[in-house]
Each structure stands twice: as structure tokens, then as C-alpha cells.
């Protein structure tokens, strides 16, 4: 059973910026399930998409892999000779735990977990690239360049899977979706204090875009098609095909 997330359950005098440290890594499976609506569906479908798009003798990347949920879903689904998965995360706590989880089961599809900044990783001969709730934590000025690098490293016909929290230009719609997300967290046992303190900790480090901004970025870079394939409240996932 996952360790329960109680990080923000007691009053914090000075709330610092949210970081993916040892405390977060320890409770991350519980935190993510109780915080992101539809997370399990997204993870399952990433495996389905990887099964469809992974090619023999190609690389599959999970950028910002955290504890490897998407990596493991893809490994279970991919059955292509010479295909390998490369997971990358800059949190040493996440990488250490991810390696343990990956090594707990053997598979014909090799997996390498790297501790690195995803902006510094070479993307080469890729058939699938996953950014699962990762891009939103990069500085907005760095996002286009990373996606350009991913595009350059993808094979023609390759797929980028981008899961994100969204904001919406319609103020009323945006507020409703935020409120529904908070209702979701309440229904999963988070208190008003936890919701408030987590929001304060994360508001300066997670800066979401609109769906239109994502689509324009894909189009400007040269992806031939892109679309939202999953959305629940203000969270969702898109694909972009080279």
C-alpha cells in the first residue's frame, strides 16, 4: 500500500516552493492518484500508444519519469526487437526509487533510468517521447526549445505524448474547472488546509499553458498533427505526431 501523503496536513509557517525531494518521492504514488483526475487512465493509455508507435531498434523516452509509472506501462506494452526505454529525472530521490521499481521485474525491453536535466539530454532515433506532467514545471522560456529538440530527435511518424494541467482563457470556465479539481481532492480526503498550502507551494513552480498555446507550439515546430486525447477537468493529455 502506498505511503499516505500528509506533507501539507499541518500548518506550515513559511511555505517554500514545491520540490520533488525525498519526502515527496516517499508519498508520490498516493499524492498523484489523489491529486490528478484520470491519472490511472492516462498511464494505461500511454502504454497503448507506445504499443502502437514504438518501432524496432528505436529509443523510447520518458522525460521527467518520477517513479516510472509511464515507463513501466510502456515496458509492459512494447514488444519490439531492439527497442529500449530511457527514463530521465533530475530528482535523485525519484531516480533512486524508480530504479528499484524498474529492477523489481525483468523484461525483454531494456530500461535505463538517468539522473539528469531533461533539457540536457540528447533525443536520438526516438519513436515515442513522453512528457507526463513535466513540461509545466519548466520555465516557459525553455519549453519551445525542448519540444524542438524532441521533434528533431523523433523519427518521421513518431509520437510525443504530453500530459499537462491546463488553464483556460474563459475566466468563468477556468474558475469552475479549478473548483471541480478542488472538489476532486476533497473527495480523495485532502483537507482545506492541505489544498491551500499545496496550492501556495506549487503556484510559482508549475505554470500551465492553455491548450491553444500547446497546439500553436506543436504547429510552429512542425508536427503534422496534434490533439487532446484525454481531459478531466483542467488536466489532460495530448499527442503530437511528426
UniProtKB/Swiss-Prot annotation:
The keyword Nucleotidyltransferase belongs to this UniProt entry's keyword annotation: no
Family matches, as CDD domains: AdoMet_MTases (cd02440)
InterPro entries for this protein: CmoA (IPR005271), Methyltransf_25 (IPR041698), SAM-dependent_MTases_sf (IPR029063)
Record Gene3D superfamilies: Vaccinia Virus protein VP39
Pfam families xrefs: Methyltransf_25
Amino-acid positions noted as binding S-adenosyl-L-methionine in the UniProt annotation, renumbered to this chain: 39, 64-66, 89-90, 117-118, 132, 199
Listed EC numbers: 2.1.3.-
GO molecular function annotation: carboxyl- or carbamoyltransferase activity; S-adenosyl-L-methionine binding
UniProt catalytic activity: prephenate + S-adenosyl-L-methionine = carboxy-S-adenosyl-L-methionine + 3-phenylpyruvate + H2O
GO process annotations (BP): tRNA wobble uridine modification
Domain of life: Bacteria
Principal EC category: transferase
Family matches, as SUPFAM superfamilies: S-adenosyl-L-methionine-dependent methyltransferases
Annotated keywords: S-adenosyl-L-methionine, Transferase
Quaternary structure and interacting proteins, as annotated: Homodimer.
Function: Catalyzes the conversion of S-adenosyl-L-methionine (SAM) to carboxy-S-adenosyl-L-methionine (Cx-SAM).
Family: Belongs to the class I-like SAM-binding methyltransferase superfamily. Cx-SAM synthase family.
Protein name (database record): Carboxy-S-adenosyl-L-methionine synthase
Organism of origin: Aliivibrio fischeri (strain MJ11) (Vibrio fischeri)
Gene name of this polypeptide: cmoA
Amino acid at each position: 500500500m502506498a505511503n499516505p501523503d500528509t506533507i501539507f496536513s499541518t500548518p506550515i509557517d513559511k511555505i517554500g516552493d514545491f520540490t520533488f525531494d525525498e519526502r515527496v518521492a516517499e508519498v508520490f504514488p498516493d499524492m498523484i492518484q489523489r491529486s490528478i483526475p484520470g491519472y490511472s487512465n492516462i498511464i494505461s493509455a500511454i502504454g497503448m500508444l507506445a504499443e502502437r508507435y514504438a518501432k524496432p531498434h528505436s529509443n523510447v523516452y520518458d522525460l521527467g519519469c518520477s517513479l516510472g509509472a509511464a515507463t513501466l506501462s510502456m515496458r509492459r506494452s512494447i514488444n519490439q526487437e531492439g527497442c529500449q526505454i530511457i527514463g530521465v529525472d533530475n530528482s535523485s530521490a525519484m531516480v533512486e526509487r524508480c530504479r528499484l521499481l524498474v529492477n523489481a521485474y525483468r523484461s525483454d525491453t531494456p530500461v535505463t533510468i538517468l539522473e539528469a536535466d531533461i533539457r540536457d539530454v540528447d533525443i536520438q532515433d526516438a519513436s515515442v517521447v513522453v512528457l507526463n506532467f513535466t513540461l509545466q514545471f519548466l520555465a516557459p522560456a525553455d519549453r519551445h526549445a525542448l519540444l524542438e529538440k524532441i521533434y528533431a530527435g523523433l523519427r518521421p511518424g513518431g509520437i510525443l505524448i504530453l500530459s499537462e494541467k491546463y488553464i483556460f482563457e474563459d475566466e468563468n470556465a477556468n474558475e469552475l474547472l479549478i473548483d471541480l479539481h478542488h472538489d476532486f481532492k476533497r473527495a480523495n480526503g485532502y483537507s482545506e488546509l492541505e489544498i491551500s498550502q499545496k496550492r501556495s507551494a506549487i503556484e510559482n513552480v508549475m505554470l500551465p499553458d492553455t491548450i491553444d498555446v500547446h497546439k500553436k507550439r506543436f504547429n510552429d515546430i512542425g508536427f503534422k498533427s496534434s490533439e487532446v486525447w484525454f481531459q478531466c477537468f483542467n488536466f489532460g493529455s495530448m499527442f503530437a505526431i511528426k
